[in-house]
Amino acid sequence: MVDFPSRFEVIVIGGGHAGTEAALASARMGVKTLLLTHNVETLGQMSCNPAIGGIGKSHLVKEIDALGGAMAMATDKGGIQFRVLNSRKGPAVRATRAQADRVLYKAAIRETLENQPNLWIFQQACDDLIVDQDQVRGVVTQMGMRIFADSVVLTTGTFLGGLIHIGMQNYSGGRAGDPPSIALAQRLRELPLRVGRLKTGTPPRIDGRSVDFSVMTEQPGDTPIPVMSFLGNKEQHPPQVSCWITHTNARTHEIIASNLDRSPMYSGVIEGIGPRYCPSIEDKIHRFADKESHQVFIEPEGLTTHELYPNGISTSLPFDVQLQIVRSIRGMENAHIVRPGYAIEYDYFDPRDLKYSLETKVIGGLFFAGQINGTTGYEEAGAQGLLAGTNAALRAQGRDSWCPRRDEAYIGVLVDDLITLGTQEPYRMFTSRAEYRLILREDNADLRLTEKGRELGLVDDARWAAFCIKRESIELEEQRLKSTWVRPGTEQGDAIAAHFGTPLTHEYNLLNLLTRPEIDYASLISITGQGCTDPQVAEQVEIKTKYAGYIDRQQDEIARLRASEDTRLPEDIDYAAISGLSKEIQSKLGITRPETLGQASRIPGVTPAAISLLMIHLKKRGAGRQLEQSA
């Protein structure tokens, strides 16, 4: 066995969305980092749909960006259609979504990786972990090379024991065209970690030259074109294109229903549970039998390819059935399938065996991020990767680990849900999962996280300077509005009354006027002739002013809960020894091993009375230790 000539502080296994963010985060913090990938050509590859963002997901992307991550900037460089979803609703649920050119997105990620100081890339599959006395010491590659490191971050995606299904045929694979990680999967199953199987799928890809777009509904992007990154601009965007909408029909549903016996999912061949919120077309037909049709979004895969992604017809049915399904859909009667759809089963590990840092509880220095933790989606993977990479670097630096709270970031919601509740199906982020979504908007992710990112070493000088200018501009504009008064009967007062249809009864400052629902910031500054032209600053001023009462109420609630939320539970606490706790609650607490009282309170079945007993126990334990020290 040969040793690699260099030792690293952090090794990241896997070059997908979790792995790239993990490696970049660690390296940005000044830690010597190795990114180990089975194929350098697939770094940052979009394995499924060619899109970034969406409801709940864009919040994660913006948080990654606020902490210096690459996903949003790569989206701005590769995005070929941008839309703001829920644009007519409140700011808490608005979400930016971008179609991405696969080639351009992947190229942007690779360029970022190759130009990141402290980061080395090496092409080799990982077959084994070096573990000594419950501490990870490094990895062993497929050619028997040992590489030593203080911490290892596993971001293996769907590759662990990956099994691809098309009809009744199945074969080993990490995704179509890539080998699975069999040796590593077997090694991980030897560790004292709970393991399960999940499933995901992808639709057949269609040749756009064989599609009749004239009978479909065009879906253009938004104008003006949104940007994804806080540092992004429209000039970075490549040429923009449209998506198209068509629908399944009674004939489509009949084809699927009559072939369910040939579906590996319905014949019992597939054991893994698939994503609830991204079901296969056969699952939709079975679960929603009363629906006459389902939308199919025809999404371009890029500017230099004819391939289309028919979002909404993910399937693992045999190829001949896939062809019938596709050709039964309006506009695709003569469609040519370039790549068949398939389902893939893979190993995942119960995230309740992780700490908030995403370090495993049983092996020191071993971190998990992405689909290995039971999540689905590029954005969820990227967020976990950034957090795991950050904490691996903090460990190397001898610093305390970090994870944002539920009231600080969607990343915090994601991790808390996973390590507290676990998951039996692929976990997807939604805004509805966050209790404090009015303060966790996508538009203020930088105001929530960039200062912390700077403290951790994740945010570079350029981003920090831009952020400081923005933050100061918001404060100055709020002060200007607060100190600018308008009186009834004056030229400005009459202009405001005429424009908004609201007569002024007495003197108002502009900040007071902006709280009114009928008055918007853009119109206000056009009348007064003064104001901020930076759209990000203007947006923050308007949202903070109009929703101030609701935001203050949420902040008060957070402050009340924070004391118990942050109270830490000792790692060696013996729940069986706490009198008054039921056997059921003792068992649940013993299995999850919550890190704080707040986390304990969110375990299903753990009652407020049980939390009170824990608080009493902690006070007694603290008093007992003080007596021991004074004796």
From Swiss-Prot:
PANTHER family: GLUCOSE INHIBITED DIVISION PROTEIN A, PROTEIN MTO1 HOMOLOG, MITOCHONDRIAL. It is found in: Cytoplasm. Keywords: Cytoplasm, FAD, Flavoprotein, NAD, tRNA processing. NAD(+) binds at residues 274-288. This is tRNA uridine 5-carboxymethylaminomethyl modification enzyme MnmG. Belongs to the MnmG family. Homodimer. Heterotetramer of two MnmE and two MnmG subunits. GO terms for molecular function: flavin adenine dinucleotide binding. InterPro entries: FAD/NAD-bd_sf, GIDA_C_N, MnmG, MnmG-rel, MnmG-rel_CS, MnmG_C, MnmG_C_subdom, MnmG_C_subdom_sf. FAD binds at G14, G15, G16, H17, A18, G19. Its cofactor is FAD. It comes from the Bacteria. The keyword Cell wall biogenesis/degradation does not apply. NAD-binding protein involved in the addition of a carboxymethylaminomethyl (cmnm) group at the wobble position (U34) of certain tRNAs, forming tRNA-cmnm(5)s(2)U34. Its main location: cytoplasm. GO terms for cellular component: cytosol. One of its GO terms (biological process) is tRNA methylation. The lineage of its organism: Bacteria, Pseudomonadati, Pseudomonadota, Gammaproteobacteria, Pseudomonadales.
